[in-house]
Amino acid sequence: MAKSATGRGRPLQQLQIVADLIETPTLARIYAHTEREGPVTVGELVDELGVPQGTAYDYVQRLETAGLLDQVTESRPSEYDTEAISLTLSVDGTTTTVSPALVAAIARTDTDDDVDVYVERHGLDGLAAALEYAFERVDETVSHRIAARELDISPLEAEIVLQALEPVAAAYSDPSG
């Protein structure tokens, strides 16, 4: 198995790339797609995500250098797979965990206007909160009206964002429970 220079043991470098994932939807799309479908080649990322080839190579290299992607084959074309992300931030008593599911939700801002508009209105913290309700909605433990009340948004906006995030919540739901 091929080994690459990674960011393991360099938490601040990994923090920087996680910040980049949060701020760069295309980078988040590459990570999220590789996490769900990996191992993948750069060519597959280009074809399946419609990302320009130069961008795909650059972003794969950035993720690999930070230790979030690993080259898993020595043969050409190289295949890459992900390392799990789990970064918990606590600010002023509010805790948020950056997980593969949240990265996948952020990635949707690049391809889903409803998610993009929601982030414009409520920010990434609002998206993280809405994603938690999307998980509960997939588990059928919450309605859009309850989510609307608790997120302090209209029932229509709650329904729209929960529907937009449902594929992410369904893909990352714990099948055991």
Question: How would you label these PLM feature ranges?
Answer:
Residues M1-G177:
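Haloarchaeal acidic low-complexity proteome signature biased toward cell-envelope/secretome components but also
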